[in-house]
Amino acid sequence: MTFTLRRPAARVVLLDRAGRIFLIHAEDPIDPHKPDWWEIPGGGMGWNEDSGAAALRELHEETGIPNVEMGPCVWVQQTEYDFAGYHFESDDRIHVAWCDGGDYDPQ
């Protein structure tokens, strides 16, 4: 049986000063046969958490990139996906942000 989790989420389109977009290469940790994918950083929002604050927190947790200038929410969407044995129904708030760039190797 698959559980459904419905949650608000905040995500970030992160651009460096050269206009490059930062993407995360992801895979499902419990389904090795599922194809991998590229995504923008982000995740679930805390109770009463502002979407900009949540986007910045998730960006830092997932990438560790310093000195980020967070911009406004530029898009709102509803998504559904399966990940790690759960079915997610997510209300996403997409923010834009900028960083100085550089070579990053988040783990």
Regions found by a protein language model. Name each.
Residues 28-32, 76, 80-81:
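Short, charge-rich amphipathic segments
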Residues 44-69, 77-107:
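Unchanged
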Residues 34-35, 44, 72:
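Intrinsically disordered regions, especially transient/low-confidence alpha-helical propensity segments
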Residues 1-39, 67, 99:
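N-terminal strand-loop-strand
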Residues 24, 73-76:
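Residue-level detector of high-confidence beta-strand sites
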